Amino acid sequence: MSAVTTDEIWPLKVLLDTLRSLSSRTSPTEPWGATATAEARAAIGSFFLASGTMSILQVELTWRDTFSAILEVYKQTRSPEASMLAQNFVGLILWRISVRWDKTSWQENSHRLRRLVAEMTGEEAISWLSRNNLRISAPFGPSVMWPLISEWFAVFEDAANHAFTYTPEHLLSEREFSFNVGDLAASLAHKRFELIYDFPFVQEGIRLVSIASGWIAPFVIMYRCTTNRVFTPLTRILFTIALVDQYFRGLHAPQPFQIKDRFAEDVGALGSKELIPALEANSTKRTSYEVRASAAIAYESPFVHTIQPGMAADKLRNGSDIIMSDTSLTEDSLAIHLSAVLRLISDIGLEEDNGAIDAAKAKLSNSARRAWDAIQYSSSPKQLLEALIERGFVRQVCRAYESALKTYFTRNYGSVDEGDIFDDVQQVVGCVAVIGNVVFGLIESYGPGMTYLSNYMENCVISESDSHFIEALGLERAIISQIIGRCIPPIPHEDYIKAARAVLVAEMDHVASKSEAVGFRQSIRSAKESLMLWFDNRANEIWGIVPPDESNVLNLDANLPNSDYSNVDSNVEQDEFDGERESEMIRLASTIRYPEPMPITPESTTPHFLKYIIATVCLDALTSVTTAIFSTPRLGTALKVLTWARDYGMPYLDSFINHRGKLNALISAIIPFTQDISNAPTTDDALNIEMLLGELYDVISVAISMLPQEARPFLPPRPDPSNSNVLISMHGTALHLQLNYLAERTFDCVEHLSNKSKQLVVFASIFKDFFTCKFVSGISGGTVKLYHHSELHSSLGTWKIFDVMTAIRELYDSANNIIADIRLDSMKLRTIIEETGKQLLLCDDIMEQANALGQDAVKLFSVLGADFAGLTRLQNSLDLHIRKLTSCNTPPGMQDICWLLGRWSILSEINSTYRDRSSHELVSAIENVGGVLQDMMDHDLASIGTDDKSVAGEIEFAVESVMRDYPVITEDDTTLVVTLSSRHNLTHRDEINFCTLDIETIAPDDVDLTSFARDFITKQRVTADALVNIIDTVFNTGRRANGDNA
């Protein structure tokens, strides 16, 4: 734990320093005077209001001295505030201790905190209370806190030890393991701990245990899927790979034999329906997931992620056939096959028959719809996880599917209506994936604490950038909230918070009832108000609990009107008040000076004096803020005045229309800009402070209207940018920072779009140079030779036509992906344009209001407005160019590439009817599209100065760029030969080399028969008699078998 610096302050130290200062000014043998008593009560009231937190070390350093000083205050003054704080010291301090634990530090830090609690509730503290005749059984006192907290720590340590004991490897050895999400964390929020539930260390313990155990339930469900014999072997294999990738990834991760053995057994059951043989698979490209799956299957181990160089491996089938197979994948868990589903929902690389694709999509849609139905019927975390995981929607695939669909969405956004972008299978898979991502993002912090509550609020709110995507899926935000709210809702135990508040109120009332003096009763009301203001603000910020009505109502003396203060007649005489006493109050109000405390007199401690305090002290505080320039030193000074105004009269006087709450809110809004210079203000911050200043202004206005006419101070106009330095300077700072921020975002967007556009030009140039080549049919069927268009004697290489077309499609798809990225960036740019437009309007509005502050302020916002307008023009110009770039259905310069690929798809469907004739037709088609593309490229690239003729180096670079991943075919290459095996049969006529049938056998003229003499003499030969005997044996055996049957 870090050391405490000498200039560091925290609430307990501030209280200690104030009480020490008071003690140093008074004699220990003499009773304290009214002024010292008032200052002590004010100090305790300020501590009740303090919103700061403390570390364990800070409390260790100061709690004894502070506790002793509070007891000294009580001994000298018998004030109820000191009694309340001393008797409930333990709870009120622990409520302010902030802790942060992790897997390695929780034991040491929790033991340290436990020792601190033991000291604060030990014999020494109890004896101090007893000597002063104070209770030790107060609700937050030592006799109540120590048993409760020590029991909680015992439960916490047991829960944390259990949570961190569980490991994936440990759970594999459990025969039957049943675990409900949140069980361990729920024990830390039992009803018996409701009094300390809101304490920060309790919430930190709940957070730690929730995160430490949140992975267990998903792991158990997924592991169960890897061993479920109802699933097919391939389904179990894919679940096992997902399990290993999520829970056993890393250099030192264990490799349990149970998983290895079952995986190897399942791999042995795979056949040609699930795998493509290595010889055929090596000529095709694989995604990273397919490489990972192929490596695991080849080595029969899910812990192998890559294929060793030079090794051939079978490839997992990912076409529509694997989806349609009744024996390969379990029908309810088709989503676990990541690569196959991605191909169907992305429409990438689909070259099968349209009917087969439609059938596969329909089957996948039905499978995903059953998952969606199961989600709809779920009502608990376990049921929801089972509905997702058992149907193949594990964490990895949900992320991949949502990402793929977002890419697809941006590629098609704007070209068709939002409702028509996705087909049925994309919508249902997307809906389940979106829900899955939300669930997996929440489940690992699921628990009854504030951490899960904040995560829940963040994850269930769909960002504006995703709103169009969610709507295109047909998924409503209300449905997401309904499902999550039904299955894994937050459990914040608001009743515990309200019960703790009720206990605090009851304790304050009990202390007040024991007070004999009227002044003490009034002061405990003020202390109660301060403590409740702190508690209610905290409950609202952390838990979102709106304070009870009674905490916000006016708490004035019955002599003061408490209805509509806007209609108060200031000339109405107050009951029991004479002119002399009123004059004395006016005189006292005129002597109020910052930072002096309130003078203690009969007139100043009456509730009637409160309106004078508001009209002077609060008006000074308001003026100090509105006249300050937005800077750390000036705001620091204003903050001190605000704090002084909030605490003024606290021991004796209640709030006036909740003025202390409004001052406290203003303090909270300003503090961030006085503590950390890196906190940049926004226009929303400025508007918030303007609103808070307005609320305080209304309170001051009411108080002034209640004063006698001759005593009313001048009330300035309501604070706004036209009359407030802090608002105009804060708006100016915020708008300047926002201009820089939006300009930086625009620059990043421009830079990214520029790079993407350059890539498109490179791709277009590569296609242009590539199609200037001469394409000639190779000697081997299904191949094509590439030549320089003007140098036919120099071949650039021979490739399979299938490889050439695949390479062209990949490059074209890469260009399409770039267009999709550009469309996505264009959506971000439009968001930036909207934000810039809003800031421009705000800038103009403030410029009009700034007229009253002089021409310098007007000029500042005029220049800012011109800068915003210039940025807007730049953004709109860029947006116009992007719209032109993305308005086509194909990347620029590639329309005929799209036409060629479309024709190739048609030819692929009927390719079985073609032999060499198909090769010639494809060569002709390629030559034709090359000529068309050349004309098109000459036109499209003229603006960037591209030469009309491609030089040899450019052509070679283009061919290398397109075909770099595909092997060159030589004349004697055997790669076209397909080996028949149990895992492969000929499915395509292009796989057969028919040229062999056309080659005639011609005997050489110079056959040397003597070269065969050695073999003829030395090797054993089969004689004719031996052959006859074998044939007779076979036939005779057949006859006898027939005779026996007869």
UniProtKB/Swiss-Prot annotation:
GO biological process, one term: virion assembly
InterPro entries (alphabetical): Herpes_UL37, HSV_ITP
Region spans: Interaction with large tegument protein: 543-1046
Keyword DNA-binding: no
Keywords annotated in UniProt: Host cytoplasm, Host Golgi apparatus, Host nucleus, Virion, Virion tegument
Stated role: Plays an essential role in cytoplasmic secondary envelopment during viral egress. Interacts with the capsid via the large tegument protein/LTP and participates in its transport to the host trans-Golgi network (TGN) where secondary envelopment occurs. Modulates tegumentation and capsid accumulation at the viral assembly complex.
Lineage: Viruses, Duplodnaviria, Heunggongvirae, Peploviricota, Herviviricetes
Membership in a protein family: Belongs to the herpesviridae inner tegument protein family.
Keyword DNA damage attached: no
Pfam family name, one: Herpes_UL37_1
Protein name per UniProt: Inner tegument protein
Oligomer status and interactors: Interacts (via C-terminus) with the large tegument protein/LTP (via N-terminus).
GO cellular component, one term: viral tegument
Gene: MDV050
Disulfide pairings: none
Subcellular locations according to the entry: Virion tegument; Host cytoplasm; Host nucleus; Host Golgi apparatus, Host trans-Golgi network
